[in-house]
């Protein structure tokens, strides 16, 4: 009130006092303006109606009606929306700081398939890689002086089963199989004899699962036969049509040859005294040799005898 009275009726002696009051009022207005510029939306995220930029002019006394609940002017609503947009941008930049790293799938995709879906060639390549890796690891362990166990594989089972299977290529298979098997016959015979002696001494033994040895052998043989059958079916599925036809023709030839051999053996068993057996054929050969010798002697005698009117040995007498 004193300020208003002094402004209405100023005196000459109080000019300095009036100037000081005006400067204090201006400084209080600047402080209020700075407080309004710090928008509470930066802290709480809500849009405050009193937020405005520094470039906006100071609100007049007539504009205070909008703060009392009455609708504000268009300029004030526009300023509020701009302030809210600025505040939200500031909050997002302040909270995130830098661009968020989005994880993307790697370009180097690992093409992995389960083992039962692999083809025969892929399985073979996988086994070869695993064998090479195992041998490399074993070599490293051996170089470090650590104990090394042999590489665990079941390939020897397939090799033994292939030996027992008949060779379908009868013409070439006999020579190759004879050359290959001749190396291992002695060692295999010795192993079989040793196993038979052990079984006789131990009374049959067991397979380690509480069953007798014979039952365990039958179970293992059945299991192995099923596994080998699955392998054979898979091999046939991977063959082309021409390969299947060729395989079928070879099997037909082999079956016809085996049927002929079977019929011949049955005939020999039914008629043991027939010339089809080994002793009869040997006797026939001996007789043929004797006939050849007699013919040679006859020819020599014909050459030695002089040409005369007397008939020779083989000359027919005139009738």
UniProtKB/Swiss-Prot annotation:
Residues 1-111, 157-223, 262-286, 299-319 are annotated as: Disordered. One of its GO terms (biological process) is negative regulation of transcription by RNA polymerase II. Residues 24-35, 306-319 have a biased composition (Polar residues). Residues 97-111 have a biased composition (Basic residues). Residues 203-216 have a biased composition (Gly residues). InterPro entries: HEXIM. GO terms for cellular component: cytoplasm; nucleoplasm. Transmembrane segments: none annotated. Residues 240-306 form a coiled coil. PANTHER family: HEXAMETHYLENE BISACETAMIDE INDUCIBLE 1, HEXIM P-TEFB COMPLEX SUBUNIT 1. Belongs to the HEXIM family. Homooligomer and heterooligomer. Core component of the 7SK RNP complex. This is Protein HEXIM1.
């Amino acid at each position: 009130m004193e300020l208003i009275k002094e402004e209405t009726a100023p005196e000459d002696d109080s000019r300095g006092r009036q100037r000081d009051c005006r400067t204090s009022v201006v400084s209080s207005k600047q402080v209020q303006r700075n407080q309004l510029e710090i928008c509470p939306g930066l802290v709480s995220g809500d849009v405050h109606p009193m937020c405005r930029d520094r470039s906006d002019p100071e609100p007049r006394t007539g504009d205070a009606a909008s703060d009392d609940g009455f609708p504000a002017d268009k300029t004030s609503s526009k300023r509020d929306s701009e302030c809210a947009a600025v505040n939200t941008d500031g909050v997002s930049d302040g909270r995130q700081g830098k661009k968020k790293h989005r994880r993307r799938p790697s370009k180097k995709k690992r093409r992995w398939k389960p083992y039962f879906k692999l083809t025969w060639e892929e399985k073979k390549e996988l086994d070869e890689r695993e064998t090479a890796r195992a041998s490399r690891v074993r070599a490293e362990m051996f170089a470090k002086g650590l104990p090394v166990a042999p590489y665990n594989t079941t390939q020897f089972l397939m090799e033994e089963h292939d030996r027992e299977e008949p060779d379908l290529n009868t013409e070439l298979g006999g020579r190759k199989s004879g050359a290959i098997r001749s190396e291992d016959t002695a060692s295999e015979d010795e192993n079989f004899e040793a196993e038979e002696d052990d079984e006789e001494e131990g009374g049959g033994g067991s397979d380690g699962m509480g069953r007798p040895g014979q039952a365990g052998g039958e179970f293992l043989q059945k299991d192995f036969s099923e596994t080998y059958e699955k392998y054979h079916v898979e091999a046939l599925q991977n063959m082309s049509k021409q390969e299947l036809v060729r395989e079928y023709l070879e099997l037909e030839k082999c079956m016809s040859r085996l049927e002929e051999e079977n019929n011949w053996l049955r005939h020999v068993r039914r008629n043991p005294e027939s010339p089809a057996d080994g002793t009869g054929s040997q006797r026939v050969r001996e007789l043929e040799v004797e006939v050849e010798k007699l013919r040679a002697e006859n020819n020599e005698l014909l050459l030695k005898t002089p040409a005369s009117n007397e008939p020779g040995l083989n000359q027919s007498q005139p009738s």
